[in-house]
Every structure is written in C-alpha cells, then in structure tokens.
C-alpha cells in the first residue's frame, strides 16, 4: 500500500464520494477514475510519510459543520434577544433551511394528525385549518403554521431535525431553547 499527500480540498472531495462505511481511498479513486480492480496502472508516485488516509469518519465533517452552525445560532446575540418562542422557532427553521436546504425540503413533508405543518405557500396551510396562522419562514420559500403551543413547536423542530439526520444531543439543545 502506497500513500500520497493530497491538499485539503481534494481530500474533502474524495471523502464526500464515500458510498459505504469501510470503503478504502483506493476503492473510491478507482470508482471515480472508472478503473477496473484487476487493471494495474504503472504510475510512479513519490512516497511521503505523512499522507492523508480516508476513513469511515471522513464524511462526518459535514455533520460536524451542521452542528457547529446550529450551536453558533444558539449562542448568537440575535438569537438571545428573541423574547418569544415564535421568534426563536422562526430563526431555527430559517437556519435549518440555510444549512441544508435539500434535507429541509425532504423533511418538511411532516404532518400532524389533522394538519400540514410546512408548505411552500400560505394557501396550503390555510386549507388544513383557518386558524393555523401561517407565517413565511425568513429567507426560505416555506411557510409554517404558528398557532401552536411551544411544546408543539418543539415537536415540529424535533421531527424536522430527526429527518434531517441531526444527532440527538443537538436536537435536544435546539428544542430546549425554543
């Protein structure tokens, strides 16, 4: 086994291409370069003692960044001055969308027993109940119902974050401050 040194940007790209836990850097590169496993390329690569090794944890940096972003929100001055749960709720939703819009879109399909919680227009929320008090989530194309109690808002954020694959620790912290 040879080792090579790669810059940080290339390392992150290779790590992001991991398809399953335990996949080696050789497997990833072979797949990306479409080289069959049997074919041996004769390439001379200088050996350097401190190469970067792609591991099963390499792809987790994205998740750490998401957690860092949420923690940064929770300790921000802008968040701290929100006097009401609705303000904190809207900031959290806006941040979740900004951090991972694709994950948010997928997760926003959650519904209650009788209500739709999120929609891309006010009318869809009003159709599920005239007293839903829909509000646009800042800096997103989404609307959310707001005439729920604080516990229901926590449940909505909890369900959203679970579907977006956040870990339990950050979900509890975020829901605890609504």
Curated annotation (Swiss-Prot):
Superkingdom to which the source organism belongs: Bacteria
Renumbered residue ranges of the record's region Interaction with DNA: 113-117
Keyword tRNA-binding: no
Keyword DNA repair: no
Cellular component, GO annotation: cytoplasm
Swiss-Prot/TrEMBL GO biological process terms: negative regulation of DNA-templated DNA replication initiation; regulation of DNA-templated transcription
Function: Negative regulator of replication initiation, which contributes to regulation of DNA replication and ensures that replication initiation occurs exactly once per chromosome per cell cycle. Binds to pairs of hemimethylated GATC sequences in the oriC region, thus preventing assembly of replication proteins and re-initiation at newly replicated origins. Repression is relieved when the region becomes fully methylated.
Protein name in the entry: Negative modulator of initiation of replication
Source organism of this protein record: Photobacterium profundum (strain SS9)
